């Protein structure tokens, strides 16, 4: 699901809200989450999951074109850990794996 699809679904379910207001709310929510993670804080949404930063240490990579070693600096990457309720809901009734 894309951001625009999410906005459409919410606007369809909450018809008393203007489409523009739903779009603003979704964009504001995502911007605030991005700012919070960028400042190093953790985000916890009970029943859904938590977002945090994980540190990737510096390492030696390889240039795929030349094969030469390249020093890659350490960095932080966003990480999502689903909550129990979300895991249970996703797995409820799933007996076969999702086919790609």
Curated annotation (Swiss-Prot):
Gene: ihfB
Record flagged with keyword NAD: no
Descriptive protein name: Integration host factor subunit beta
CDD domains for this protein: IHF_B
SUPFAM superfamilies for this protein: IHF-like DNA-binding proteins (SSF47729)
Keywords of the record: DNA recombination, DNA-binding, Transcription, Transcription regulation, Translation regulation
NCBIfam families according to UniProt: hip (TIGR00988), PRK00199.1 (NF001222)
Keyword DNA-binding: yes
Regions of compositional bias (Basic and acidic residues) in chain numbering: 82-91
GO MF term list: DNA binding; structural constituent of chromatin
GO cellular component: chromosome; cytosol
A GO BP annotation: regulation of translation
Main function: This protein is one of the two subunits of integration host factor, a specific DNA-binding protein that functions in genetic recombination as well as in transcriptional and translational control.
Gene3D superfamilies documented for this protein: IHF-like DNA-binding proteins
Source domain of life: Bacteria
Region (Disordered): 53-100
Assembly and binders: Heterodimer of an alpha and a beta chain.
Annotated family: Belongs to the bacterial histone-like protein family.
